[in-house]
Swiss-Prot record:
Co-factor: note: Manganese or magnesium. Binds 1 divalent metal ion per monomer in the absence of substrate. May bind a second metal ion after substrate binding.
Alphabetically ordered keywords of this record: Cytoplasm, Endonuclease, Hydrolase, Manganese, Metal-binding, Nuclease
Family stated for the protein in its record: Belongs to the RNase HII family.
Function field: Endonuclease that specifically degrades the RNA of RNA-DNA hybrids.
Gene that encodes the chain: rnhB
InterPro entries, A to Z: RNase_HII, RNase_HII/HIII, RNase_HII/HIII_dom, RNaseH-like_sf, RNaseH_sf
Protein name: Ribonuclease HII
Record-listed a divalent metal cation binding positions: D15, E16, D107
NCBIfam families: PRK00015.1-1 (NF000594), PRK00015.1-3 (NF000595), PRK00015.1-4 (NF000596)
Required cofactor(s): Mn(2+); Mg(2+)
Entry EC number(s): 3.1.26.4
Gene Ontology terms: cellular component: cytoplasm; ribonuclease H2 complex
Enzyme class name: hydrolase
Subcellular location: Cytoplasm
Length: 197
């Protein structure tokens, strides 16, 4: 059981999606839930079906006291590395909340340096903390939608299928077609594809 920090009224949960993909932004979400308006079935977004995720995402947006998305683009990831870009995107999500939280719970083992709000990192937080579960769902739904949009632009890369992750199919497409402007140049398979073309 996770014990919430005492003495804080508004607690935000923050999570990121998209550290592993070779393409596109890393997307984060920050969520302050309403204790008087609970949401059933919150869990780590990776453990939910797409249908369930989409339904929960709508419910979170409706019932949460505040929610916001943040992002760091592929060129930022290449510039400052994926970990720093994830932390930057988390800060952006928190700063975009229409209500400022008193405390922030961050999934993982690192806290963004420039939050300026008391914070705690929670390993496996997307399983343990409802606010982080909610954030993981919003971030995952947002990023998957972006991959579906990219798929419409470049159907030959099959982004809707692999969501940009380095699957066998994605690596084959990279080798065959080369990298797009949206690909993360600092990631080894993309670097390799750029050298070939």
């Amino acid at each position: 059981m996770f014990e919430y920090p005492q003495g804080y009224e508004l607690i935000a949960g923050v999570d990121e999606v998209g550290r592993g993909p070779l393409v596109g932004a890393v997307v984060t979400a920050a969520v302050i839930l309403d204790p008087n308006n609970p949401i059933e079935g919150l869990a780590d977004s990776k453990k939910l079906s797409e249908k369930k995720r989409l339904a929960l995402a709508e419910e979170i947006k409706e019932k949460a006291l505040a929610w916001a998305l943040g992002r760091a683009e592929a060129n930022e990831i290449d510039e400052i590395n994926i970990l720093q870009a994830s932390l930057l995107a988390m800060t952006r999500a928190v700063k975009s909340l229409k209500i400022q939280p008193h405390f922030v719970l961050v999934d993982g083992n690192k806290i963004p340096k420039d939050l300026a709000i008391p914070a705690q990192a929670v390993v496996k937080g997307d399983n343990l903390v409802a606010e982080i579960s909610a954030a993981s769902i919003l971030a995952k739904v947002a990023r998957d939608q972006e991959m579906e949009e990219l798929d419409k632009q470049y159907p030959e890369y099959a982004f809707a299928q692999h969501k940009g992750y380095p699957t066998k199919l994605h690596l084959e497409k990279l080798a065959e077609l080369g990298a797009l402007p949206q690909h993360r140049r600092s990631f080894a398979p993309v670097k390799k594809a750029l050298e070939q073309f």
